[in-house]
Amino acid sequence: MHDAGSTPRTDTRSRVQEVALELFAEQGYEKTSLREIAERLGVTKAALYYHFKSKEDIVHSFTDDYFADFDRLVAWAKEQPRTEATRREVLDRYVGIVLAGHEVFRFLEQNRAAVETMHAKDRFAHFRDRLDDLIDVLVGPDAPLRSRVRASTAVLAAGASCRFFLERADDRDKLRAIVLEMATDLIPLAD
């Protein structure tokens, strides 16, 4: 769930997240128990409980990590000069985050009802704010509506294309390059 520039986690917490996402994808969130997660990990339920008190805590942890990657991207991008090279790098990092976190996004899509009961609305509002910030970084906060729409189209289409083609593409790097090219073409430096 981390792209280049962020620190990957190889600890128990990350392993729990990975296994939980696998089981949620296989069985659904509602049909997966903490016991099953612990069994797949090869640990006791008590050991799992030490890290996470509930499935909801696990979900919050991996969604928070995913959204934190976007926060880091926006914070970094705000410190950069507004150039074509920066714009391309911002889009490349964004595409990397989307590709790295595709399992999280799939979970969110497949388990909407469960997510709605988890008080996740604040997290999604925060994520929408980060997307607004990303658009500001790409075209400027005072850009005309046409430029902002082009930037949002580029960002949203890039994310959707990554998720749609990831399992269909033979070459993940080629997919990333194509999506980056498409997104970059949608946002000229001056509109």
Language-model segments: residues:
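Helix-turn-helix
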Residues: 15, 19, 23-57, 61
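Hydrophobic alpha-helical connector segments
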Residues: 61, 74-106
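Short, hydrophobic secondary-structure boundary micro-motifs
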Residues: 106-109, 117
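Hydrophobic alpha-helical segments that form the core
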Residues: 144-166, 172-186
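N-terminal intrinsically disordered/low-complexity leader segments
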Residues: 1-11, 164, 168, 191
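Short, basic, alpha-helical segments at the C-terminal edge of helix-turn-helix-like DNA-binding modules
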Residues: 64-71
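Amphipathic alpha-helical packing segments from all-alpha helical-bundle domains
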Residues: 71, 116-152, 177
